[in-house]
């Protein structure tokens, strides 16, 4: 497999408290050995429209909608409040497990995140989170719903909890050394007919191309 990645970020932000933006990610690959006649492939792996509103007293809200794979999916819809070094957030958002997931995917060096971050990534969930950040220390905790936002009487809902901590002994302009640890607790949903709850982990690897091109 020879992979070539094309991250294209398209944004159009307006001045003022209301900002609109978007992005388009194209992932391509040249497969030297597979069972398909086509060995080169490119896909639009992510396309989004984003709206952000900054309100007085450090209130902030964001709505992010994705349109990749011929589907409309909600990516983010949350309200955030900041008090000095403290940040509170509630809504539909990332269930973060590691410090890397604090950064926007627009800032990733590669198309995907690190395998550890991708594997233990909760996905987006309805929940609440708290973050404390200053020059030397950072900590964040979150509590989120289970595997879905809608339930019926046949499903016993689960929940998820995350915790992250970072110590930055060196954090100056052009210089950074940080040491971090992250924790994840998962209690997945369970149908009442089943006895066990099932936890699954997966990762995108180095590309977002469809799995069929890997075979």
Language-model segment annotations:
Residues 3-23, 29-38, 189-214:
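Outer-membrane beta-barrel biogenesis signature
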Residues 14-32, 36-149, 153-188:
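Outer membrane beta-barrel
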């Amino acid at each position: 497999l020879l992979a070539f990645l094309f991250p294209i970020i398209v944004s159009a932000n307006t001045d003022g408290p209301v900002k609109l933006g978007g992005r388009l990610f194209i992932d391509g690959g040249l497969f030297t050995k597979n069972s398909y006649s086509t060995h080169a492939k490119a896909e639009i792996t992510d396309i989004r429209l984003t709206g952000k509103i900054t309100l007085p007293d450090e209130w902030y809200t964001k709505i992010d909608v994705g349109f990749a794979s011929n589907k409309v999916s909600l990516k983010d819809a949350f309200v955030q409040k900041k008090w000095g070094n403290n940040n509170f957030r509630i809504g539909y958002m990332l269930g973060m497990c590691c410090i890397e997931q604090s950064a926007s995917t627009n800032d990733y060096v590669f198309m995907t995140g690190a395998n550890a971050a991708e594997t233990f990534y909760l996905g987006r969930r309805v929940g609440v989170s708290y973050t404390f950040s200053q020059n030397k220390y950072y900590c964040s905790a979150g509590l989120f719903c289970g595997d879905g936002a809608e339930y019926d009487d046949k499903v016993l809902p689960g929940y998820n909890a995350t915790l992250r901590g970072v110590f930055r002994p060196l954090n100056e302009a052009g210089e950074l050394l940080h040491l971090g640890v992250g924790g994840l607790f998962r209690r997945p949903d369970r149908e009442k007919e089943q006895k066990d709850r099932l936890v699954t982990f997966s990762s995108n690897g180095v590309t977002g191309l469809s799995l069929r091109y890997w075979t």
